[in-house]
Amino acid sequence: MSGPSDETAGDLPVKDTGLNLFGVGGLQETSTARTVKTRQAVSRVSREELEDRFLRLHDENILLKQHARKQEDKIKRMATKLIRLVNDKKRYERVGGGPKRLGRDVEMEEMIEQLQEKVHELERQNEVLKNRLISAKQQLQVQGHRQTSYSRVQARVNTGRRRASASAGSQECPGKGLRFQNVDEAETVQPTLTKYSNSLLEEARGEIRNLENVIQSQRGQIEELEHLAEILKTQLKRKENEIELSLLQLREQQATDQRSNIRDNVETIKLHKQLVEKSNALSVIEGKFIQLQEKQRTLRISHDALMANGDELNKQLKEQRLKCCSLEKQLHSVRFSERRVEELQDRINDLEKERELLKENYDKLYNSAFSAAHEEQWKLKEQQMKVQIAQLETALKSDLTDKTEVLDKLKTERDQNEKLVQENRDLQLQCLQQKQRLHELQSRLKFFNQESDINADDLSEALLLIKAQKEQKNGDLSFLEKVDSKINKDLDRSMKELQATHAETVQELEKTRNMLIMQHKINKDYQMEVETVTQKMENLQQDYELKVEQYVHLLDIRAARIQKLEAQLKDIAYGTKQYKFKPEIMPDDSVDEFDETIHLERGENLFEIHINKVTFSSEVLRASGDKELVTFCTYAFYDFELQTTPIVRGLYPEYNFTSQYLVHVNDLFLQYIQKNTVTLELHQAHSTDYETIAACQLRFHEILEKSGRIFCTTSLVGTKGDIPNFGTVEYWFRLRVPMDQAIRLYRERAKALGYITSNFKKPEKMQLSSQQAATTAQISPAESTDGNLNELHVTVKCCTGLQSRASYLQPHAYVVYKFFDFPDHDTAIVPSSNDPQFDDHMCFPVPMNMDLDRYLKSESLSFYVFDDSDTQENIYMGKVNVPLISLAHDKCISGIFELMDKEKHAAGTIQVILKWKFTYLPPSGSITTEDLGKFVCREEPEAVQRLPPKSSDVTSVVAPKPKPRQRLTFVDKKVSFADTISHPSPETSPPPKDIKDSSPEVGPKPENGLSAVAYPSKESGVAKVEENVGEMQQGKEDDISFLSEGQLASGSVASSEDETEITEELEPEDEDRSASDSDDCIIPSSVSTNTKQPSEEIRIEIIALNLNDSQITREDTIQRLFIECRFYSLPAEETPMSLPKPQSGQWVYYNYSNVIYLDKENNPAVRDILKAILQRRELPHRSVRFTVVSDPPEDEQDLECEDIGVAHVDLADLFQKGRDIIEQDIDVLDARTDGGTIGKLKVTVEALHALRSVYEQNRKDLEA
């Protein structure tokens, strides 16, 4: 048989064997031709075409899958929507029989189910087709590598190679009988293979066509499904709209039903509450009524007993009053003279110190600020200032003389008033004695009339009848004449006796009547005199108040003038000159870097930061490879906004970016430069996004020591962690004005401010000591452990010869010490001074028990001097240990002690004073040994002896740690005695805690290296008692001031001294006011009994201020604001600091609170004011008035403070409403124009308890 004919058989070249071959060659030719034809049939479709067709089918299959999934998701969404709609519809039908079911819902559900079934069928067909494709691919691969029935093709020409094996040799050289048999087998196998491959190809082609048809049919079905989906969407939208309408109707119905139900429930709840409240009130009233009845019974019994004791107590009270008056007169005279001498001595010392400071300051100012060219102008100005100062001094002296005259007159009037009061008391006593005698006589006369039953008229009538009878019977009854005469004689005698007694009683009554008339006349005269004296006293009081107001006004004017002059002097001496320059152009700068000149005003400077380039490390370069990095840097300096360098491409970026900052070289800026760093971040840009790849810290502290451009490099650290060493950054910075000039000006300015503020603190220190004495005197000695309570006064006067660790800076010194078991106490910071004046006074109330006695005899008081400008903590400038054994022997410790640093070198001196207020009485069980007596400082008034260092086994005292301080100089604010214990003042930082084993260099050594100039003084008990009385009196009188804190803080040194002079001699009737106020005194909580009840105080808190968008927010002259609070005629209180003006819609927080005390003993006038408010009298200031005041800026101190807005809180309305104002916003009205609302003020006014207390006290007067 011949093989199948093939049209492409002639396409391939076939070797012609020729006609010389035998029959065997012809058979071989036919077999090879068949194999060639089958291979041609298999290779008719190329491998690339098959792969291309397969890949196309694969891609189309994937697309069909994606499309089918999308359609499946859409169908699922539609199904869920339909389920929700059906559930909602069923629910609405259950609730209220909603809309009827639509007719096409069932059809749509059936259609959706049919579509889902079709999708599942298509997915199954798709999987079947995919499996067929995979099997076809595997078959094609098998066909491409199909093994023939021969392991190798036999060569037609003998090449002479060895045969592979014997079996191969036997195949190639078969026996003669087997040769043609093998050829037949080959011819039978090859046709079957070709047929099989052709059939497979045909099947694959048919399947591919079927797949194409299926794809086309699926596309048509998908289009139909999409069309159906759109129809379903439209139907769903229509159904959704209908359901939404029905839902809205149902919701409206439900809302109306719920509202009506809620209203009914609310009404029932209200009625129930009212019923419960009324029943509770009725039960409470019944209980109160029963209690009142019981109390009335007990009161009747106690009233009878009290009336019996009242007479005895009145007699004792009269005797005690007489004794008290005599003792008060003696005490007042002695106390007044001693206080006057002490005050004058203190004033002299303060004025001498102030004169020395001013002289030093003036010399420094003259040497540093005045140049030779303008010397004459400065001299003229200096002379003018001296003339003005002399004029002001003369005016002050005249004011002081007038004040002293007024005070002398007031003293004489007081003496006269006391004399008149004493005379009035004597006359009242005499009047009471006469009344008592008259009462006794009247009682005796009544008793006589009642016992004798004889009346004068009856007696005269009886005598007349007897006489008539005698005349009638004279003739007939003569024998009875003798008897009648005897009877008449007896009657006459008795009559005469009765007449004599009657005349005596009448005479005594006349005498008492005349005496009572005289006493009445004398009392009238005394009343007239008292009225005239009180009138005179009221007139004098009014004149005195007017004069005081005039003096206050004059002092305010004088303080404003002095403040203006000080501002001018500071501007001339301390301020920098205007600095105008054109920046120099360096060779490495671009020409157009600066295009205009820069004007620096007084106190300003220009700080420049230049980022040059970034050098990446080798690790970064290896990691980046051939890619170019696109980078830029960002950093934020001080309180300015973020700066960004240009974006640079490359592995060696050079930015050459310079940023300039206009800064004020002040304390905060210098501290920021010295301590803080600036974070520079390196970012990599990716089209519109970026990521941070590295960061570093830029330091600028070297600018304090160098000038000009300072070049620095710093290391970059990777943020991701894989490359820690990222590279380096090169940068430079500088100040345009040289830094040494700015530092010098800053030091002088800080020193001048320190001198000014230290003078303000002196009168407050005096008030501190006096009020501490007053508060301590109120503590009962019985409350201590041993029954004895004493008070130790520690005064740190000054330090001299202090040196900072940085040689070019002056220290900001302050002293810290810890006494007994009290917390650490630190003084105020005196900036930029080698010889700081602290004048810090502190009182420590302690019980005189065994623990204190042991502490005084075995311990020393360590004083540590720290530098606030030193960056290293726990490093003190100097330290001294003062032995306290002299205090155990009731002696004063006063002297100048040498300070030692941590290396035991001399670091200056410190002057301290330690003394007891009362006589120190050691406890009964204490034993004084000879060893302890060695530490007593010997009294040497003439020779000054330095004590050698002595070693003692004294328990080591841990050094206090310096606390972090703010560099703001503030004035210590008064707080109440109760607030001092329970609520610490927010403006004073908390005391430092004890630190044990904090560092080896801070802990004190066991030896006492002490060299002192000691002046111990023995004080007697009588002198200390008199001193205590004087200090208490001074503290009570100093507490009364007609100047507000704002006026005190804004005034000058002279004005603060004048304030102390004005307040030093006020009325003794108001002395008790200091009991309700006291400065920050350390009082143990165990002996604190002066806490005020809520009914004895009014608390006012100013929380925050908010301004609307008005003219005030747009005015440039108004920059800082503070709040003033005033109640009736009481002194105004101000917030301690003025804050920047808030923008529209923003709040600024003051958090300032003030307490007005209303205790009956010390503040009856304030209670009278509240009584008048409750009576709703027409008072000028019946509400609490808050005034928003603008504070002029520092560079324009010649401007005056201006009232911007006013807010009110009416106390009568508060009492009527029955609730306090707690953090409520009240309207602030414009105080300058039409009175419109300009903002809100958030305040707290707690006065309800106080108003209720006043109302209960004066209920009868208020209800009448």
UniProtKB/Swiss-Prot annotation:
Q: Which domain of life is it from?
A: Eukaryota
Please give an example of a GO cellular component term from this record: cytoplasm
For region Disordered, the annotated ranges are 979-1018, 1047-1093
Q: Where in the cell is it found?
A: Cytoplasm; Cytoplasm, Cytoskeleton, Cilium basal body; Cytoplasm, Cytoskeleton, Cilium axoneme; Cytoplasm, Cytoskeleton, Microtubule organizing center, Centrosome
Q: Which gene encodes it?
A: Rpgrip1l
Q: Which UniProt keywords apply?
A: Cell junction, Cell projection, Cilium, Coiled coil, Cytoplasm, Cytoskeleton, Repeat, Tight junction
InterPro entries the record matches: C2-C2_1, C2_dom, C2_domain_sf, RPGRIP1_C, RPGRIP1_fam
Q: What is the stated purpose of this protein?
A: Negatively regulates signaling through the G-protein coupled thromboxane A2 receptor (TBXA2R). May be involved in mechanisms like programmed cell death, craniofacial development, patterning of the limbs, and formation of the left-right axis. Involved in the organization of apical junctions; the function is proposed to implicate a NPHP1-4-8 module. Does not seem to be strictly required for ciliogenesis. Involved in establishment of planar cell polarity such as in cochlear sensory epithelium and is proposed to implicate stabilization of disheveled proteins.
- Where do Acidic residues bias regions lie? 1056-1080
Q: What is this protein called?
A: Protein fantom
Q: Name one GO molecular function term.
A: thromboxane A2 receptor binding
User: What organism is this sequence from?
Assistant: Mus musculus
Q: Which residues form a coiled coil?
A: 64-143, 196-268, 299-454, 488-555
